[in-house]
Curated annotation (Swiss-Prot):
Its EC number is 3.2.1.-. It comes from Alteromonas sp. (strain LOR). It is found in: Cell membrane. Keywords: Cell membrane, Hydrolase, Lipoprotein, Membrane, Palmitate, Signal. SUPFAM superfamilies: Six-hairpin glycosidases. GO terms for cellular component: plasma membrane. Belongs to the glycosyl hydrolase 105 family. It holds the Pfam family Glyco_hydro_88. InterPro entries: 6-hairpin_glycosidase_sf, 6hp_glycosidase-like_sf, Glyco_hydro_88, PolySaccharide_Degr_Enz. Coiled coil: none annotated. One of its GO terms (biological process) is carbohydrate metabolic process. This is Unsaturated 3S-rhamnoglycuronyl hydrolase. Residues 1-21 form the signal peptide.
Amino acid sequence: MNHTKLKLSAVALTLALGLSACSGESPEKQVQSAESEQMKAVDVDKSMPMQSIESTAKRIGESAANWQIAQFGNLDYIPESHRAKSENAKFWIQASFYIGLTRWIDATDDKQLESFVKQVAEKENYELILERPYHADDHAIAQTYLWLAERAGVQEAYMPTKEVFDMILSKPPQVGLNMGDSESSSGKYHLEGNCQLRWCWADALFMAPRAWAQMTKVTSDPKYLEYGNKEFWAAADYLFSDEYGLFFRDSRYFDAKSDNGEPVFWGRGNGWVFAAIPMIIEELPEGHPSKDRYIELYKKHAEGLMALQKEDGYWPASLMDPDKVRTPEVSGTGFITFGLAWGVNNGILTDQRSKDVVEKGWSAITKAVTDDGRVNWVQHVGKSPDPVKESDSQLYGTGAVLLAASEMLIWNK
């Protein structure tokens, strides 16, 4: 196989020209009062004409994808603490962007963007990060490789991932899901705890389960989906609160309280899971026995989330304590808006309230994207509600916006 010799930055520049002619601190320390910076007023339309939504989705999706791609090789706007990892295409930060980008490609059939994704995957030799092969974060890029395998029928696109998954199946992890009972490790690719050999934190349910379902689809071997399905439900049953209809980030937050005395439910953490559920459902074989269970969880989570949307259309970084971080937060809002829009578009959420919440969320998202496509107001890498500035931008935030735009492109059709 002839691999491209282009550097990622060069690939990005070529495409852009053609198209445009987790810290270890305790929850108490992580959940701090928001910065005193005043949020700019955000005017959110109560309703948007259908033609306006479709045209806005097309504009936002195209500009966000193009802007983000043009930044590769020049990610100076990202804090130095996470810049190197953001530049690594195999790491979850960039992989989350590709999950949104491939969804956008499916919606638009954009061949130039598809070519870009192929070149990135070839440059990485379709490989995962192997320093911690069990870690869900490092399975996120597999979703793009498997997307390419299914779309183009290229066997080499999924073989390295298959080798890793087969190893995991041969030596399945024998640890519990309690983050507090496990030991952390240091290093470039660290573990918050040994439980991360499994999917013991909310983010993991976005990063890994869909890839295991995709592997079954491309290989026709049910063992991958069986493992992914089992581990998803182990984590979901452990982290989901039936009382609130929300996911705890991990076990360390079961008893944590925000400043107002309410439980700590992280906006983006819930967004990760809520965006993942529709994409997992789509990968299930016809008649899969767990489909109804996924839809039931989706509905419970949707109800919990819809009740917490702010008047400005955003979901707060701290879902039960909106005063903790008063500024917009677009990554969580993007993931949640995508999930809700998917439910409306697929006839699962049929009431007018759901439609209104989606349109309000989408209108808020559009206010956070600049004319040239930069996605602002994105909370940086973390695991709990942290302060957000307007200039904060990250690849997964763009991925979230692309997911939402892909559904708004077909809104109510």
